[in-house]
Regions:
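Bacterial N-terminal signal peptides that target proteins for export
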Residues: 1-3
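Hydrophobic small-molecule pocket/channel-lining residues, especially in calycin-type beta-barrels
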Residues: 14-161
Length: 161
């Protein structure tokens, strides 16, 4: 019992790291209109608000932010793991804990995109997010592995409101 209390207190005793400075993630800050085209052809439109949270350690993306009754709602947190030298993505949505996930990915050499990989017992999922600095548009390609084959689950296009 004492050991558990000690282990729980260790993170509290350490000072938090300095605010994360990341020019790539800074591009998420703001309000966005998102068009999501599902693999079955269905289209969903929603709003996303991006902001720095948790002492500037994560970008929070709130799908459905400001909508009265959003068709889809999710909270996505993206941060950087300094030890592993990769980005982390925590995703939770209206489909519940069964579908929540932790993905990891590296920023491409041109500083324009990250492909996050989420692994589970049912297979893998990737989400390749990219930013075009000229048009200021985000894109996202979400693919899912089913029976050894990769299929497009959804494609998104984000434009600033």
């Amino acid at each position: 019992m004492v050991l558990l209390l000690f282990l729980a207190a260790v993170p509290l005793a350490a000072a938090p790291p300095p605010a994360l400075k990341d020019r790539f993630l800074d591009n998420f800050v703001g309000d966005w209109s998102v068009v999501r085209k599902m693999g079955n052809g269905r289209t969903i439109e929603s709003s996303v608000r991006g902001e720095w949270v948790l002492r500037h350690q994560f970008i929070q993306l709130h799908y459905g932010a400001g909508e009265k009754e959003p068709e889809y709602e999710a909270l996505v947190f993206i941060g950087f793991d300094e030890t592993a030298k990769n980005y982390v993505c925590h995703s939770v949505d209206v489909f519940g804990g069964r579908y929540s996930g932790l993905g990891r990915g590296k920023l491409d050499p041109n500083l324009l995109g990250i492909e996050f990989r989420f692994d589970s017992k049912k297979g893998s999922l990737t989400n390749r997010v990219g930013f075009d600095p000229e048009t200021k548009i985000w894109t996202s390609l979400i693919r899912q592995e089913e029976n050894g084959q990769w299929k497009t689950l959804a494609e998104e296009k984000w434009t600033r409101k």
